[in-house]
């Protein structure tokens, strides 16, 4: 199954929801999203060997919350959604969508928020980014979107991505179209922007028991059935790993067919789990999966591969 985003004026009366309707897409709800992430990161930092790193990520997430409201985005995406639908492409495709300088403004504001909180190497990194030319920023953004991580140092990447993510999340939250599921391929990528997931989550509430993958860029969530590899869609050789026991709130779902894994979070086990924060706080599980011979099929926005990785 792939998910296409259909413009409002192309939705017919047949689109009415039934009792068993499963929302294929959950567009980002930005109110308090970054504050919740920052709070969860700070909570998970307690008694965690990665505590300093989690608190560092919390500072960035909190800055994102501030900058989000300081620099709102107003844009009409109706024409873009129609064009993308006609082409069968994600409306905010990271590989083709022209980037507005709005994200440069977001980056500079993030840096201004973070400078008083940073010291040492981290401060040097953001001061270096503050002086970067527009061309240099665009080159780094293009390299990250092309997964050419050797061209962007792993200490700069989280700050660049934080600004890009804010920009894409702002756009995604403004999409006036609705989504419907259609058969196709490439459901391992976000149907809104084409980026990859950070984790998947089995939810509670109105989407009780349903699994959604969470985009590491635009914060959209999209439905993928459980007991299926989110990377290759095979079902025959899946296994679930955890650091605790079978009731753990965070597990890794591995696939023997494609040799990858993606973490799966369970809100019914812990309602406070957060896609980015809980992934970052369980890097020990990633190390274990690597020892077992599996490759991660996702990237956390605070942890990018460095040169040679």
From Swiss-Prot:
Localisation: Cytoplasm
UniProt keyword Transcription present: no
A Pfam family hit: FdhE_C
Gene Ontology molecular function: any one: ferric iron binding
Disulphides: none
Keyword Cytoplasm part of the UniProt annotation: yes
Classification via InterPro entries: FdhE-like_sf, FdhE_C, FdhE_central, FdhE_N, Formate_DH_accessory
Main location: cytoplasm
Top-level taxon in the UniProt lineage: Bacteria
Keywords: Cytoplasm
One example of a Gene Ontology biological process annotation: protein maturation
GO cellular component, one term: cytosol
Function: Necessary for formate dehydrogenase activity.
NCBIfam families, per database record: FdhE, PRK03564.1
Family: Belongs to the FdhE family.
The protein, known as: Protein FdhE homolog
Annotated source species: Enterobacter sp. (strain 638)
Gene: fdhE
